[in-house]
Structure formats: C-alpha cells, structure tokens
Amino acid sequence: PIQCIVTCRGINSPLSIQPDTIEISYLMQTGMLVWHAETAQDFYDWILMGYMVSEEPEVHLPLALCCDGFFVTHTKDVVDLTPTDMCLPPYDPYRSPVPCMDMECPPVRMMRDPFIMKSNYISYATHASWQQEVWAAAERSRKHTIAWLNGLIETEDVDADVLIVTSGTAVSQGREAIRLLADEGIRVGLVKIKTLRPWPEEEIKEATKHATHIIVPEFNVI
C-alpha cells in the first residue's frame, strides 16, 4: 500500500503557504486511512508507523499522512531521529490479501462472448462488495493504530467545563489559548485527535462527556 504525504495549504487564489485543511475532506470517503500530525515530530514518527499499520495483511490500505502548511512545512524544528539500525521489516507481497500479479507473465483474458459476460458480472459483484471490505479493513486498522500511536486521541484536563477538540497544528494553537486562559483563571481542557480515519468516535464521546462547552478550531478558509 502506498503512503501519501499531504501538506495542507491554501488551494484557492491567491497562492498561499498558510494551512487549509479542506484538502483533507477530499480524502475522508476514499477508503484511505487518514492521520493528521500536529508537529514535525509527529510527522516524522508517523511515516514509519503508517507503514507498519497499512501493511498489516488484514488492513492493506493506502494511508494519507497530513500536516498543516507553514507551521510544519515551512518552519524549522528539532526532531528525535530513529536509530540508524532501526528499519521497517521487509514487505512480503505474498501476505497481501490481493493476489500478486506476475508482470513477467501477466494473465490475459481471451474468451468468447458468453464467458466474457459472466466474467464481467463477477468483476462487477467483486467491486460492489469490495467497498464494504475497504471500510471493514479501515476498522480493522483501529487496533494496530492504537498500539502504534498510543491511542487515537490525546487528552488533557478533560474534566474541565470547556474543551478544545481539534487536530493538526490547531492543537498547538489550542495549547497556547489554554495557557492564556489559565492566566485569566479560566480552566480549559484539550482533546487532540490523531486519526480521522479511523474516526475515534467513542473515544471523543468519552472524553467530552463532562464538558458544557466544546470548541472546535480548524484551518479552513473556504
């Protein structure tokens, strides 16, 4: 499975390097796994973790690792590198849920009409059911994602009456807002969403069950 690195920047005129997460919305219903990094460290670490999850035989889906424009793409930061002797395990295509195609001797379909019609029907039925399998695979990725990312969400002070719930670098700005509000005596909690697919619905419900006000900041100028 491929991994797409998505740097979310303004797609409307004029050209901009500022963050705009509308690009992520185009990926939400494609069947891809979608993760949203807050920092350069997240971005670096999750590339390797993404391969570990997406290459699981029961998952085997492409993954979109998203980060926000400017704050991650156009700034400098210090990250902890993985040890030089740490490598991804070799990918074994024969563990894939989809049979490998031998490009040296590819299969060719040469049949008369009745057989072709039957074959095309089988292809249609396969693709019609495959959509359900893709979404099921995304759900099966949940346990692997939780293990590698240490949960689908990250929380701070969720017993506060006011919570900021967001993803990406809006989390960093949320942390700054929480610091400023604390100086004024206002206590605010934080829920950082790490993955959009799979969507951590139950985790968010549990984290926000005591909140009376929920604020959801995002970078979307359209």
Can you describe what each PLM-predicted range is?
Residues 45-48, 75-78, 175-177:
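A short secondary-structure junction signal
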Residues 17-69:
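Conserved thiamine diphosphate
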Residues 1-5:
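Hydrophobic or amphipathic alpha-helical targeting/insertion segments
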Residues 6-8, 68:
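Histidine-centered beta-alpha loop that forms part of the nucleotide-sugar donor binding/catalytic region
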